[in-house]
């Protein structure tokens, strides 16, 4: 399946920042790419333009695609299962997996970025986490982390969980956090522990060029992403 699951070591650490920059870089290279968020919480319908799905839609060049990108949207800024329950709904992992597989199939040889909610072990349903969805999809992972103090422990913990589940880690991205230690210094300290996982840095701001990350992923994950259907 031509999909890459974008997950993180936690919430609000830069997944969408990285996804948007990656989408732009892939499009510049002529690759066919799309984005899908199986579920999003903390979504304000009165301010949809400021949401993560809207940012992804803009990066794709289709600002109207917000609802297509994120079919399950809930208001409360809580874990998706709780946010859904507050609106009288129950999330079913199989439904989200089926939707993601269908979206990937529509692209044929393109690449679908599936952006999770929260971190690797964040709950999606009452009994299942993002890791369960990753395993069900069988997709490689792009692991995004912040550069704050303590991030090395969080990255290594996430990698232990992913590798124990036999998940392929395509790359690790350190997304620059506000008021954090030096980004390069954090990367240098982390690199020896990654056991071969490629490491990339994502400075803050829209000017970051994810070209090197895009080139790596096209070669490692989606070598046929130039022949899909947009």
Curated annotation (Swiss-Prot):
Binding site for Mg(2+): 16, 52, 115
Molecular-function annotations in GO: ATP binding; dethiobiotin synthase activity; magnesium ion binding
Binding site for substrate: 41
GO biological process terms held by the UniProt record: biotin biosynthetic process
Protein origin, superkingdom: Bacteria
EC number annotated for this UniProt entry: 6.3.3.3
Residues in the signal sequence: none
Binding site for ATP: 12-17, 52, 115-118, 175-176
NCBIfam families from the UniProt entry: bioD
The protein's name in its UniProt record: ATP-dependent dethiobiotin synthetase BioD
